[in-house]
């Protein structure tokens, strides 16, 4: 089915703002149950006290839920933010998104982070965070289209997921590319969040954050794996949240001191390039290197933080990952 033939359940138009000092100055609220979409201002007090990222997530979640909210309550929210440094292309790791919700595993607030391009693209689209609330009666897709660029008109829509829309991310990603991206550059400037059918059967569901790999000309995914946020996402009957932005550069984030940002970023890159191969080895092992280090220092959260180490750690540490799953 073509995008223009899909049933739009709710629509919200807005003017795409310029970013200033890492902020768009507004957050996006979407209630998939009631079909409500609105923008909410980011106050100076929010910036001063909570900065962004996890801070904004917790602030917005606090005001969205109540004392009786459980993970499967309609008023439970999933909040995603990248923070003021998100999308600063000079900095390694600035593609991170942080998501928060009330966990189906613990019934308390948790947060989880992931790479990919969704967080920065969300901000480039004019939003410092997104709140997803409510529970839909049908599977829906949330789209954020800011392809008109700064000063243009953007659109947020809740769309009825058509019958040919897959659930599982590895298939859904191809469908989204074919349906919402007309050209290769369109695919590079689009990112989405989804989960899979497995989240229907577990409270440990992950969120998948996409990025388009220009060299491979294909999608890759990063996971927010803590706390079962994907289970909450699927319970709300959201298939995907898609964001489209426009071309961006080193100054898109509106830094107060671009020269200092560039110099600091260059210093960080040199340090990572020099020391990562002999210290963390993140390039070859990813976050699996943390398993051994945390076990050595009695910090590994074994059995829900009852213990800090486990005798079987050598079976799943970075050495095993590098031997079994990489091409090094």
List the predicted regions and their residue ranges.
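Intrinsically disordered, low-complexity segments enriched in small residues
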Residues: 1-113, 117-328
């Amino acid at each position: 089915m073509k995008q223009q033939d899909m049933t739009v359940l709710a629509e919200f138009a807005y003017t795409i703002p310029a970013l200033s000092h890492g902020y768009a100055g507004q957050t996006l609220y979407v209630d998939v149950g009631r079909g409500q979409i609105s923008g909410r201002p980011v106050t100076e007090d929010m910036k001063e006290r909570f900065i962004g990222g996890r801070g904004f997530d917790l602030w917005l979640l606090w005001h969205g839920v109540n004392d009786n909210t459980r993970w499967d309550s309609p008023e439970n929210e999933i909040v995603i933010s990248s923070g003021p440094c998100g999308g600063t292309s000079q900095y390694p790791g600035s593609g991170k998104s942080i998501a928060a919700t009330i966990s189906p595993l613990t019934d308390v607030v948790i947060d989880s982070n992931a790479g990919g391009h969704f967080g920065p693209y969300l901000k480039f689209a004019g939003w410092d965070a997104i709140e997803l609330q409510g529970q839909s009666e049908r599977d829906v897709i949330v789209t954020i289209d800011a392809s008109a660029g700064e000063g243009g008109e953007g659109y947020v829509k809740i769309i009825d997921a058509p019958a040919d829309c897959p659930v599982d991310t590895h298939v859904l990603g191809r469908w989204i590319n074919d349906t919402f991206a007309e050209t290769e550059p369109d695919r590079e400037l689009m990112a989405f969040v989804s989960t899979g059918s497995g989240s229907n059967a577990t409270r440990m569901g992950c969120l998948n954050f996409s990025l388009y790999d220009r060299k491979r000309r294909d999608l890759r995914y990063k996971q927010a794996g803590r706390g079962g946020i994907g289970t909450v996402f699927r319970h709300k009957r959201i298939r995907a949240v898609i964001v489209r932005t426009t071309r961006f550069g080193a100054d898109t984030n509106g830094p107060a001191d671009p020269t200092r940002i560039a110099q600091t970023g260059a210093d960080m890159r040199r340090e990572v390039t020099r020391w990562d191969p002999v210290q963390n080895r993140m390039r070859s092992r990813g976050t699996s290197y943390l398993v051994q280090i945390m076990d050595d220092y009695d910090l590994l959260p074994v059995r829900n933080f009852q213990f800090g180490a486990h005798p079987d750690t050598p079976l799943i540490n970075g050495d095993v990952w590098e031997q079994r799953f990489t091409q090094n």
